[in-house]
Amino acid sequence: MFGQRQSMIVYLHSLKHAKILRKYGNIHYISKRLKYAVVYCDMEQIEHMMQKLNKLPFVKKVEQSYRPFLKTEFENSRPDRAKEYDYS
């Protein structure tokens, strides 16, 4: 039902135009202080959306999130010592 999603970080000159980003995907977060927005869209459309967003006059730059491509299971990591003890 749902496809794979990926986020883009869109840096803006002004937050006045942040509502326009709704056309390009789901807005997850907007930082007022650092002037960026996190926008989610389908993985198949990520390159196309990045090109469209870069053409907008109020956008400084667009970066792709690499989180879906990172390995989240770590090898040789030591377990936490506090969790080793049974407190029952």
UniProtKB/Swiss-Prot annotation:
Which Pfam families does the UniProt entry name for this protein?
A: DUF2129
Q: Report TM segments.
A: none
- GO CC term, one of those recorded: cytoplasm
User: Could you tell me which InterPro entries the record lists for this protein?
Assistant: DUF2129
Query: Where is the protein found, in the record's own terms?
Result: Cytoplasm
Do the record's keywords include Ion transport? no
Chief subcellular location equals cytoplasm
The UniProt family comment states: Belongs to the UPF0298 family.
Q: Which HAMAP family match?
A: UPF0298
Q: What is this protein called?
A: UPF0298 protein BcerKBAB4_3759
- The scientific name of the source species is Bacillus mycoides (strain KBAB4)
